[in-house]
Amino acid sequence: MKIFIHLPTWLGDTVMASPALYTIKEHFKDAQFILYGSFVSTALFKEFPNSKIIIENKLSRYKQALSLRKELGKIDLSFAFRSAFSSKIILHILKTKQRYFFDKNKYKEEHQVLKYLYFIENSLSIKAHFKDLKLPFKLKFQNPLILRNGKKILGLNPGASFGSAKRWDASYFAKVALNFSQSHDILIFGAGKAEQELCNEIYQILKEQNIKVKNLCNKTTIKTLCQNIAFCDLFITNDSGPMHLSAVYKVKTVAIFGPTKFTQTSPWQNENAKLVHLDLACMPCMQKTCPLKHHKCMKDLKPEKVIEQAKNLLKNSHL
């Protein structure tokens, strides 16, 4: 059997889709999988068993689909984890026998992990037994970037792909790092031009204070990003893809929420995570930039609140 899967676009969504993907894998143990999607989503599942990885060409996706129809031949089942109309066209071009499409308007108030699981359960008329986040990477827990002085590692992730509204202030991240700098060395994570500026700002603030810090922005692959986050003793992050990676590895995490719904995208089943957010009337707006122009959901969320939650995590030895 040959199964085509159109993965979610974003890193975090793809992580949250992992229980659903492994549910399909469990149900069709001997199937061959074609995993199709963005660079980050396909990189995340590059080592998925018995699979062929195809990166979507967004500039000519329909022409690509026509070529794939000839290359792949008969496809028995296809699942689109995207609700975009383009995904429907692609699966139509491939002429899959049975096609199933994720509907983002179903189960609107459920966590995103459950939305994806219900999609597969309803499509295949099965009950999912696997509900844990899982990635196919086999990580080596010997980090080549360890700062080698006996200190623990604090990871900072100041970026977020959805838009600037999700990003906590760089100076706030730096203040948190300064608070823990006696006991932790600092790793800064990020990707892309906008995040590079944030990461550089934090890096400069810390270097001026003679804090030991490594800026890994745009210096990791998806696999080494997973490796480094898994190695952290504490992780401070916005609502983002790396936040969901930290949930996979049960890293002690303080997750900062502003405009997004933490009930739907919180770190899934990570008992080592604490959520920090305000309760403003305008939250959650779900906008890329603040429509009210004040961005109070993030600006009024002061570093002291994050520091307090981080200290609570660290002092609870059972975590």
Curated annotation (Swiss-Prot):
The keyword Glycosyltransferase applies. It catalyses: an L-alpha-D-Hep-(1->5)-[alpha-Kdo-(2->4)]-alpha-Kdo-(2->6)-lipid A + ADP-L-glycero-beta-D-manno-heptose = an L-alpha-D-Hep-(1->3)-L-alpha-D-Hep-(1->5)-[alpha-Kdo-(2->4)]-alpha-Kdo-(2->6)-lipid A + ADP + H(+). InterPro entries: Glyco_trans_9, LPS_LOS_Heptosyltrfase, RfaF. GO terms for cellular component: cytosol. It holds the Pfam family Glyco_transf_9. The keyword Transferase applies. One of its GO terms (molecular function) is ADP-heptose-lipopolysaccharide heptosyltransferase activity. It is an enzyme of class 2 (transferase). CDD domains: GT9_LPS_heptosyltransferase. Keywords: Glycosyltransferase, Transferase. Disruption phenotype: Mutant synthesizes a truncated LOS molecule. One of its GO terms (biological process) is lipopolysaccharide core region biosynthetic process. Its EC number is 2.4.99.24. Belongs to the glycosyltransferase 9 family. Glycosyltransferase involved in the biosynthesis of the core oligosaccharide region of lipooligosaccharide (LOS). Catalyzes the addition of the second heptose unit to the heptosyl-Kdo2-lipid A module. Can complement a S.typhimurium mutant lacking waaF. This is Lipooligosaccharide heptosyltransferase 2. It comes from Campylobacter jejuni subsp. jejuni serotype O:2 (strain ATCC 700819 / NCTC 11168).
